[in-house]
Amino acid sequence: MAAKDVRFSSDARDRMLRGIDILNNAVKVTLGPKGRNVVIEKSFGAPRITKDGVTVAKEIELSDKFENLGAQLIREVASKQNDAAGDGTTTATILAASIVREGTKAVAAGLNPMDLKRGIDIAVAAVVADLKANSKKVTSNEEIAQVGTISANGDKSVGEMISTAMQKVGNEGVITVEEAKSLETELDVVEGMQFDRGYLSPYFITNAEKMIAELEDPFILVHEKKLSSLQALLPVLEAVVQSGKPLVIIAEDVEGEALATLVVNKLRGGLKVAAVKAPGFGDRRKAMLEDIAILTSGTLISEEIGIKLENVTLQMLGRAKRIRIDKESTTIIDGAGAKGEIEARIAQIKSQIAETTSDYDREKMQERLAKLAGGVAVIRVGGASEVEVKEKKDRVDDALNATRAAVEEGVLPGGGVALLRAIKALEGLTVENADQKTGVDIVRKAIQTPARQIVDNSGGDGAVVVGKLIENPSYAYGYNAQTDEYGDLVKLGIIDPTKVVRTALQDAASVGGLLITTEAIIAEQPKKDSPAMPGGGGMGGMGGMDF
């Protein structure tokens, strides 16, 4: 076991504080509309340029073990904030650094760390209650666009694109961000249910130019097992032929005699048909087939529930307005499923999402939810260079997370003003002793730092601006760093999601409070390099030799 180095009390806290300050100084420059970029060296490829706080924080590794411990703990705040709200990582870092800095001073002055932490917790609870009380629900697409614009550093096109995507796929829909190969940033919306399985045979194609199979108003057979025998399939095929409608078969697989017969019928024009493999694997495949059956008002044909293929009637088949199948994906548009049944299925998936502990399962269930609820939107981020695309993608990701958070918990005035206004909530707090009161004061000072930093980054004097804002009693009155003007921030469209502001303070206070109560740090001692081997001397007795 390697030897350890142990530091105590103020020495320990001071060493950690140095590391925290280094990380905080690198992250805080990115805050606000006039925040600066940070360039990060990569082990291969071009350097990365970003304004994303958590990306900067994750890259910082310090040579001094004790300083690095402090930096890692604050990095944890940024990561936790990113997981909880997906935005506000810089704000969380700044708040945590302020709480630790002021708390360390108080402990050095002889105050009780545990009482300080209790005071911090009481103050944070009061601020959170104030934020929730003043939160305003997002009601319009314009407000969604404003939140996205602020998070994307004033890029209006990004805010509007996210607002359009949410409008089209709904709040439950999936919106993903990808890198584009072109210069333009585009929005691609897939309405209806799409899954990543294409046609089983190119002979099913109806549009040779586009290489797709399009079937209008088809019947849909949803089968759990493989289909290889023709005999069991014949009664359904005959019933569909008599109806004059097309047929789409979604099954684990269609092969052999069954596939050959379907292809022959399609080529002869006797039956418009297409066969597709079922999406997913194992239990997830069964769940997705049930989703398709509910969406199309059909029945999942499964021997488990006593339905044999030869007994299937037209009433058991699903219906949809149109189905579009290409080589790699199938899209069901306007399924005939009853709204009540689809909503019940959505509620069931939501409760499963709440119960699961696996991130992978949660992600897959959210995909299923989106497909049932509305659709999928893809924002393809373009740019002139790879570096520019990556930087813009970071901002679009942040903006997307911020808009989701805004829809979830509402919005507050931006620019750090909501936290500033919460100072009033700390005025009447009752605490047990003077040390706890100092804990409340630590939070009072910390919640002013984001607004100060935004002003500092835009070239103004943070202390002067914050003083002006506190003097004005209007809740939404604030400073627009982009235009260097004062006014009603909500009317100016400068708003922050309540969830982002709330979790930033809670995460910062959680780690900051623990750091204040630290009394010892244990870290590995740096390894001493062993001395190098001495150089070999010349061999003796070799003189007088000619070469």
UniProtKB/Swiss-Prot annotation:
GO terms for biological process: protein refolding. Keywords: ATP-binding, Chaperone, Cytoplasm, Isomerase, Nucleotide-binding. Its EC number is 5.6.1.7. It comes from the Bacteria. Residues 534-547 have a biased composition (Gly residues). It catalyses: ATP + H2O + a folded polypeptide = ADP + phosphate + an unfolded polypeptide. It comes from Methylocella silvestris (strain DSM 15510 / CIP 108128 / LMG 27833 / NCIMB 13906 / BL2). Forms a cylinder of 14 subunits composed of two heptameric rings stacked back-to-back. Interacts with the co-chaperonin GroES. This is Chaperonin GroEL. Belongs to the chaperonin (HSP60) family. GO terms for cellular component: cytoplasm. The gene is groEL. Pfam families: Cpn60_TCP1. GO terms for molecular function: ATP binding; ATP-dependent protein folding chaperone; isomerase activity; unfolded protein binding. Together with its co-chaperonin GroES, plays an essential role in assisting protein folding. The GroEL-GroES system forms a nano-cage that allows encapsulation of the non-native substrate proteins and provides a physical environment optimized to promote and accelerate protein folding. It is found in: Cytoplasm.
